[in-house]
């Protein structure tokens, strides 16, 4: 029970990792008219989660099972595939904050040493891989790590939509509840793809994320 409570704590939106500052292309998608209805937003969310399963989760899964040597290679591979500058910077910022928090929460997990090694080797401390490795070292099971990451991805998108005024809080939380029904089918496909075959499959999302810097007025950093 205590481990479950700790997992809920790590999934708390108030945890200061910086995720509240990023919309991952949602703000520009709304501004440029790519999304105008709730039906389109549902399709967008499904595509967003599919991309998380196809790209982030293979890295997270591999990181949770990695040793120091393979983790270094994994980090460099992830860094090479994250081509959108705003996403790249957001990942590094969140990774740094996340590792700092987990080092404080779980000093016995050896995360302080991991942080020093990343600095000494000048390795990019990306959020996704560090999320998987740090939670694994802290004693959490792989299925829980995968499910929590997908929950965070969904929660942050819906939170951004609410803050942008596209949907109301009640509608947003109803959508979040509805999407939990498809988590199992999405997660079933995670383990069949190694991180060397991970891919970003929704190009329009990447384009929207790249155009974010062109917004005249914006609430989010990406």
List the model feature ranges, each with a label:
Residues 1-222:
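Metal- and O2-centered redox machinery and metal/ROS homeostasis
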